[in-house]
Amino acid sequence: MSKTRRSPIAAAPIVLISLLVLPVAAGLWATMSPVLRPISGQDQGAFMSLWSWNGLWPAMRLSLVTGLAATLIGLAITAALFALFQGHRIFRVFLRLVAPFLAVPHATAALALTFILAPSGWIMRGVVTLFNALGIPISQTPPDFITINDPGGLALIFGLVIKEVPFLVLMCVAAWGQCDAPRRRLVASALGYGRITGFWLTIWPVLYPQLRLPIFAVLAYSMTTVDMAMILGPSLPPSLAVQISKWITLPEPLYQGMAAAAAVVQLTLVAAMLLVWRFLELMGRAISRAQFQNGIRGSSLDGPIKFFGLVFGLVGFG
């Protein structure tokens, strides 16, 4: 009996996985090696030096808060846009603006927001010009409040949301055709559910699993961004990713080791936050199931959420 010859194509997945895993493993080893060996001229290792840095916990908190908040807000805006405007003429206008805005680099978008939101930016200049035209006296000095580089990272969250919503919208467009959304929406409407509640109970459970990996990518990027955090985020202390980029450029072995240790901490934070997000998914599934069983149609939610989706949609694509 002749043996069945295996096609070379059968080994393609193994080769592809190896090509992806080996560079990552080499990078992890290069990152871990400064952490594992003692730092020359120092009595303590890289991790102990990192723990002794006073800005570690604020930097970690800033990375966690900005990453999670930007992802949640961006996903909520995307879901509201699809729940309310998918199939409408205004939604087609949104889609025409997605691709060009998606091509804008993150640093460019952050600089544009700086020119707009700064205390001496275009918004405040426009307000001053308007008041002067109306004959209302107003100070020419920029207001004494922080809009960029605020300690809470609100400007960074806003910039991340503006940049990531088009990406999530594009991912939803790619997955929308596989959800049989028109039929599901028709059935929900026939059962008396409002547009928002019907979308939440019938379309979103099918659409969301196809968005999980893009959402994870947005969450990981929002926690580890360097360029946008340097422009929009606080600097004393900065986010953990920005501090790593500063340490890695210094020639001293101490800072090289601290950068490697901080990179390991950053990787752990991202992995932990992905697990937290998965837990939030399970909670959301339980809430949706309870809402589905209580029989409340929820059509009264359409008005407020329509306003929310329209306002933030215009901000995101304008």
Residue ranges, per PLM feature:
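Short helix-to-coil transition segments within interhelical loops
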Residues: G177-P182, L186-L207
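Membrane-water interface segments at the C-terminal ends of transmembrane alpha-helices
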Residues: R6-I39, W53-G177, V206, Q210-D227, ...
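Glycine-rich helix-loop "coupling/hinge" segments at transmembrane-helix boundaries
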Residues: D227-L254
